[in-house]
Amino acid sequence: MLKRDMTIAGYDPELWQAITDETRRQEEHIELIASENYTSPRVMEAQGSQLTNKYAEGYPSKRYYGGCEYVDVVETLAIERAKELFGATYANVQPHSGSQANSAVYMALLQPGDTVLGMNLAHGGHLTHGSPVNFSGKLYNIIPYGIDESGKIDYDDMERQAVEHKPKMMIGGFSAYSGIVDWARMREIADKVGAWLFVDMAHVAGLIAAGVYPNPVPHAHVVTSTTHKTLAGPRGGLILSAADDEELYKKLNSAVFPGGQGGPLMHVIAGKAVAFKEALEPEFKTYQAQVVKNAKAMAATFIERGYKIVSGGTDNHLMLVDLIGRELTGKEADAALGKANITVNKNSVPNDPRSPFVTSGVRIGTPAITRRGFKEAESIQLTNWICDVLDNHDNDAVLATVREQVLDICRRFPVYA
């Protein structure tokens, strides 16, 4: 018999200490990694529920195990809410991650060796969009597109490459691009060469759900996303479509299960269902609008302080600070800010002369600070602290002063009150 009062704290103090330390770190550090966010206690409640015990291979009403009547309800709720949120006619909520969702799309639509047009990782793309170290770059013939000298996606070059190489699939989406993507233009190019248009909206899904960033679902054949990042749900993946193509939907379902996964994680799917319900609330739209306002305020402040922002600013939740020409690498900037309790990630910038392990930039995002309650004033103050650290990265006194200021603002804006 399992007793409900069994706890980690009294049984595994080493593990509990690590959990406690991480909880304190999240409360006492300012989180600016663009792909991170704070999920709600409701989502964590779902993820810690008895649903974790249930195997449910298959799909609602078509399972390979008995006893699935209640998890069918859970998954159906998640599916219907996802479709409502993004204007889709199809949703698969089973992918364990965004990368596995992307893998399923490749499996459903392509054969190994097929040509794919995807955004260059060095220009803001993602590993799964064709990086040579990823399955996508190993199994398929990848033709990269990128940004022009202004830092914007070069659609004319994209079209030229599409006409020349005749890809079977084109990929839209990014992990480090601060502009607005013209999904309609991408679909025009895809249609011109007879390619599938697949969009990975993982980074901007929350903004899209709230209507503050263009929705790719009406334009793409298939759309994938993570369910965390700006969407602020549990860590997981999602596949959507509004193509009204039942054969396509069957291929996508089969590519997830049994093609790439076994049993779905029902406790995570329950967390997705809760997160989708939260994203349908009016407050979520207010939150996402503030995410963009805060990002714009930060980008403008960086520029005022003499720092270069790739693309000249931001229209979403993130920005890339370009450190080329400064006596400071992305790795050093990351480390210095960490000493001041500000968490970012080093990131390559276009035409970066340094390796991906060192880089000449840092990526900054506002979803997590906005979740804490930061508005423009706090975002501007924070950016000035960041610039103080970068300007004085080898000055321990400056780092210590900024750290105390960070601790103070974190106390005033707790993650979980």
UniProtKB/Swiss-Prot annotation:
Gene3D superfamilies according to UniProt: Aspartate Aminotransferase, domain 1, Type I PLP-dependent aspartate aminotransferase-like (Major domain)
Q: Does the keyword Cytoplasm apply?
A: yes
Location in the cell: Cytoplasm
| InterPro entries for the chain | PyrdxlP-dep_Trfase, PyrdxlP-dep_Trfase_major, PyrdxlP-dep_Trfase_small, Ser_HO-MeTrfase, Ser_HO-MeTrfase-like, Ser_HO-MeTrfase_PLP_BS, SHMT-like_dom
Instruction: Provide the GO biological process annotations.
Output: glycine biosynthetic process from serine; tetrahydrofolate interconversion
Q: What parts of the sequence cross the membrane?
A: none
Q: Name one GO cellular component term.
A: cytosol
Biochemical pathway: One-carbon metabolism; tetrahydrofolate interconversion; Amino-acid biosynthesis; glycine biosynthesis; glycine from L-serine: step 1/1
Major localization listed first in the record, in broad terms: cytoplasm
Q: Which UniProt keywords apply?
A: Amino-acid biosynthesis, Cytoplasm, One-carbon metabolism, Pyridoxal phosphate, Transferase
Q: Which cofactor does it need?
A: pyridoxal 5'-phosphate
Q: Show which residues form the site (Plays an important role in substrate specificity).
A: H228
- Name any one Pfam family assigned in the record: SHMT
One example of the protein's molecular function in GO is: glycine hydroxymethyltransferase activity
EC number(s) per UniProt?
A: 2.1.2.1
Superkingdom classification of source: Bacteria
Chain positions with N6-(pyridoxal phosphate)lysine modification: K229
Q: Where does (6S)-5,6,7,8-tetrahydrofolate bind?
A: L121, G125, H126, L127, S355, P356, F357
Please list the reactions this protein catalyses: (6R)-5,10-methylene-5,6,7,8-tetrahydrofolate + glycine + H2O = (6S)-5,6,7,8-tetrahydrofolate + L-serine
- Family, as annotated: Belongs to the SHMT family.
* NCBIfam families reported for this sequence: PRK00011.1
Its function, per the record, reads: Catalyzes the reversible interconversion of serine and glycine with tetrahydrofolate (THF) serving as the one-carbon carrier. This reaction serves as the major source of one-carbon groups required for the biosynthesis of purines, thymidylate, methionine, and other important biomolecules. Also exhibits THF-independent aldolase activity toward beta-hydroxyamino acids, producing glycine and aldehydes, via a retro-aldol mechanism.
Which PANTHER family does the UniProt record give? SERINE HYDROXYMETHYLTRANSFERASE
Q: What does the subunit section of this Swiss-Prot or TrEMBL entry state?
A: Homodimer.
What is the official name of this protein in its record?
Serine hydroxymethyltransferase
Source organism per UniProt: Aeromonas hydrophila subsp. hydrophila (strain ATCC 7966 / DSM 30187 / BCRC 13018 / CCUG 14551 / JCM 1027 / KCTC 2358 / NCIMB 9240 / NCTC 8049)
Q: Which gene encodes it?
A: glyA
